[in-house]
Amino acid sequence: MIVDKLLDDSRGGEGLLDAAGDCGLMTSPLNLAYFYGASPPAAAPGACDGGCSASGPSAPGSPGSDSSDFSSASSVSSCGAVESRPRGGARAERLQVEPHMGVVRQQRGPFQGVRVKNSVKELLLHIRSHKQKASGQAVDDFKTQSVNREQFTELKNTVSYSGKRKGSDSLSDGPACKRSALLHTQFLTPPQTPTPAESMEDVHHNESKQDSCADLLQNIINIKNECSPVSLNTVQVSWMSPGEVPQGSPHEQCQDLHRGQVFSPPQKYQPFQVSSSPHMMDQASMYQYSPQNQSVQPPPQHYTHNPALEYSPYSRTSQSPSYEPHLFGREPQFCPDQSFAPLLSDPRQSENIAVPPQTAPSVQQQIDTHLQNFSLMPPDTCEALARPDASSTPLSTPLPFPNLGGNPMSTTQLGKSFFQWQVEQEENKLANISQDQFLSKDADGDTFLHIAVAQGRRALSYVLARKMNALHMLDIKEHNGQSAFQVAVAANQHLIVQDLVTLGAQVNTTDCWGRTPLHVCAEKGHSQVLQAIQKGAAGSNQFVDLEATNYDGLTPLHCAVLAHNAVVHELQRNQQPHSPEVQELLLKNKSLVDTIKCLIQMGAAVEAKDRKSGRTALHLAAEEANLELIRLFLELPSCLSFVNAKAYNGNTALHVAASLQYRVTQLDAVRLLMRKGADPSTRNLENEQPVHLVPDGPVGEQIRRILKGKSIQQRAPPY
């Protein structure tokens, strides 16, 4: 132990180690035996006697005890005993001993302690700064024995970082005791060499031993390179049987240490591989599948003969209960060399026939084509594969399967529609109905056909209409004078309407109000029914009277315009644009516009006049300032023929539009008529021009200016 603290002796006493400090022969402060042996003959005994007399009972009896068996630990404890005694007693005893030994010391100043500067002190200070609590005697033993124990990190950590030892442990003569090493299963590799960081920390320890460390490090590296590292994450699995020896050199297989899988070199896809084991060839063939994208070889599966796993080409039925459907992408393990013809002719024999497993040679084929276009191989293909040139035989011959349904369906049955099937069912139900029952009516005069049509039962209506048409009673009417065809039109059943017209229903029949089916369609806005009537009438060679009038003298086009005017009027009055009522009115507005367009497309005349007032459709649209319909009519090619048409009172459409009050679109309607050719100078039967019918007010003033042509020139486009 190094004595590094200052001893402040006010009495002028000097320590025992002053003489030793003067000699300058101490090479190691931990090996005191070497210090006593190298001291002068006159000073060593005296110093020893002085030290011995001052140490008391715990000190050795004579200097002769500093032999080879005198440990450094006892020397350190003796020095500690000398320092712990009172300074006065130590000085008195030394003064008595020195005259007796005949030694005269030179008087010096106050004692300042012993300071030794060498690499060992710096090393110990470095160890203390890094919290290495190793004892001094252990370091001395390692130094004197010249044993290099810094090569292995585990042993260094055990010696250096084991903590401060107790007093009883310091008295040991040998090296420090090692802790019992724990069994770590993860350390399956040779001990690792010191890292660069550890070498930087222990640079003072390894300066004198670089050569030996380099040799040891090279030996460890050589040992580590010779042995193949194996970790617990590595899984080496041999799928071969115990009796088989795997073929191939170690270079043909590479181990994936991270995933623990054994990979084979990339090769082409082989759907069938023959096992190299002779005894396995007799039992079953080895099946091995190796996709190209993963290059992983799963274990070849060995199949033995099992009646429950026999192959059968039929589906799971009572005739072949042993069939189990193979998984997607799995190939057939067996390739029978006998024909499937007996099985196809007699399915009951499939239970008693055992297909012997055979081995097929390797066939080169792409994996995608094999998985997607997979087909079972017939026996002729298996025979071809059994030949030596089977590697070039494609697996493209499909296996014919019998009809599993048992009852083959004819072409007519396959082409039957659902409606035809429903008609057959209804005919079977009405097979026992008499003619009187077909023609019977209820209290309202409705027959079975009227009720079926109102309910929308198309198949039943078709069967009833066909039976009643055979009796020439298809147009029989109920109490309102409506036939079944008119009921279907009012119910918006366009499919039933087309069926009835095809069977021969009259399209121009009228009800008790003089309305034809076209009037009903125009009033309700059933544009699809109009198209069905047109199509059915063309098929049955019937004439559709588009100019037929009801008892009010209105044609279907007039009725449609009046219905649309009512919707426009309601829309102008309603101030809530997003209310449900407004949404319903908008839908009805659209359907009515479509109906009017359909009527015009069918050939309805816009210039046709009603029977009571002589008004045209343009007059009716001008009465409500219906800009949408006015624009629709005036965009027709024949608009000039009816734009100035007069009613029975002599009024034109411009007279009607100019005389309106409290209409939002009145100004726009008058302007539109003037632009499309309306004559503002036309007079009615009362000799009135449109300007004479304009009401007073700010809107009237603007209308007058438009009628006089002043604002027309200002608003005219530049072209």
From Swiss-Prot:
Q: Which GO terms describe its cellular component?
A: cytoplasmic ribonucleoprotein granule; nuclear speck; nucleus
Q: Note down the stretches annotated as region Interaction with NFKB1/p50.
A: 405-719
Q: Where is the OCA domain?
A: 108-130
Q: Which GO terms describe its molecular function?
A: POU domain binding; RNA polymerase II cis-regulatory region sequence-specific DNA binding; transcription coregulator activity
Q: Which domain of life is it from?
A: Eukaryota
Return the Basic and acidic residues bias intervals: 84-97, 201-210
Q: Which UniProt keywords apply?
A: Activator, ANK repeat, Nucleus, Repeat, Transcription, Transcription regulation
Q: Where in the cell is it found?
A: Nucleus
Q: Where is the composition biased (Low complexity)?
A: 46-81
Respond yes or no to whether keyword Repeat is given for this record: yes
- Motif Nuclear localization signal: where in chain: 164-179
- Give positions of region: Disordered: 46-97, 188-210, 289-343
The protein's induction, as recorded, is: By LPS in polymorphonuclear cells, monocytes/macrophages and total lymphocytes, but not in T-lymphocytes (in vitro). By E.coli intramammary injection in peripheral blood leukocytes.
- In this chain the ANK repeats are located at 444-473, 480-509, 513-542, 552-581, 583-608, 613-642, 649-682
Matching SUPFAM superfamilies: Ankyrin repeat
GO biological process per UniProt: B cell proliferation; B cell receptor apoptotic signaling pathway; cellular response to interleukin-17; cellular response to lipopolysaccharide; cellular response to transforming growth factor beta stimulus; chromatin remodeling; chronic inflammatory response; cytokine-mediated signaling pathway
Q: Where is this region: Required for transcriptional activity?
A: 322-394
Q: Which PANTHER family match?
A: ANKYRIN REPEAT FAMILY A, NF-KAPPA-B INHIBITOR ZETA
Question: How does this protein assemble?
Answer: Interacts with NFKB1/p50. Interacts with RELA. Interacts with AKIRIN2.
Q: Which function does this protein serve? A: Involved in regulation of NF-kappa-B transcription factor complexes. Inhibits NF-kappa-B activity without affecting its nuclear translocation upon stimulation. Inhibits DNA-binding of RELA and NFKB1/p50, and of the NF-kappa-B p65-p50 heterodimer and the NF-kappa-B p50-p50 homodimer. Also seems to activate NF-kappa-B-mediated transcription. In vitro, upon association with NFKB1/p50 has transcriptional activation activity and, together with NFKB1/p50 and RELA, is recruited to LCN2 promoters. Promotes transcription of LCN2 and DEFB4.
What is the name of this protein?
NF-kappa-B inhibitor zeta
Gene, per the UniProt record: NFKBIZ
